[in-house]
Amino acid sequence: MALGDIWSYPEPFPGIRIDRLETPGMPKGCVKGFTGALSVGSAAIVNDGNAERLELTWDTGKAPYLGLWLNRGHCGQHHVALEPTNAAPDSLRDAVEAWKQFATVEGGGTVRWSVAIRIS
């Protein structure tokens, strides 16, 4: 896996199923990826067994990217996270110099944005 690789969905790597939150063969594995700039700020985690869902919506004018963090035991933690963001990847240096995916704020300026969370 290299910086800037484009992942296939739902299986970016053999045996790693993002749609099923699986990292077989990596009992303490984790993976983080980012979208390119989105036109619609909406992402959801859906339980196909009972139709429960956790949905996030946000303004892509302020946070045009989405990070997906899937952790299956790294550092003793287990979680999945949907992370709207104004830069990709997490490292500001990489976002600016390598990926060229970032927003700027004028010195002394403020940017406000929000995320709506819906559980159903």
Where do the model's predicted regions map?
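Short proline/glycine-enriched turn/loop segments at secondary-structure junctions
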Residues: 69-72, 101-106
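A broad, structure-centric signal for solvent-exposed, well-ordered loop/edge residues
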Residues: 25, 89-92, 112
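Active-site/ligand-binding surface loops and adjacent short beta/alpha elements
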Residues: 1-60
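A conserved acidic, glycine/proline-rich C-terminal tail/linker
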Residues: 81-82, 87-104
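Hydrophobic residues positioned within well-ordered beta-strands of beta-sheet architectures
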Residues: 43, 80, 113-115
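Glycine-rich active-site loops that engage anionic ligands at enzyme catalytic sites
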Residues: 47-89
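Short Pro-Gly-centered flexible turn/kink motifs
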Residues: 103-120
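Short, low-complexity intrinsically disordered segments
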Residues: 5-7, 56, 67, 97, ...
